[in-house]
Amino acid sequence: GILAAVGVVAYNGYTNSAKSSNIKSTCKSIEKFIRLETMKCNTGMTDYIFDQTNSLNFLCPLRVQNPGRIAKNAFINYVGYSRCSFCTMKNPFKQEKSLVVFNNWGTINDNHLGYVFISDNNTGIDLYCCHTTPCKDSANHTRLNIIP
């Protein structure tokens, strides 16, 4: 009885910790990937950002008025048409939901747990991930802007 109850609580704590670690790691991997691809674009190592050859807007280096929006749109295409490691991943806290969300996160709240939000602010790609509740606690989320 008591040992079983303690075991369930300990197991749930362990699985939540593993899910949080998964989100932290995945968020960091996506950040590194975006930084690498934008660097390749800006240094002439590739002709199109995220290899999205379907639009001249994605031609490297990004010489458009809103490079963040263009880079985000190319990334949306990349995730939508690719078989990358994180493209088909699910939110570990809500298995029926996709991991990556292309939307501004608005007011930070606990419904963001387990998602990787990708947005833009015209100059860069905004990345936001909540790995632990409460999400509004700065220690529980990653929020950054990647300038292409």
Language-model-detected regions and their locations in the chain:
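Amphipathic alpha-helical segments typified by the pilin-like N-terminal helix
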Residues: 1-29
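N-terminal alpha-helical signal peptides/signal-anchor transmembrane segments
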Residues: 26-45
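Periplasmic/extracellular, small/polar-rich flexible segments of pilin-like filament-forming proteins
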Residues: 39-148
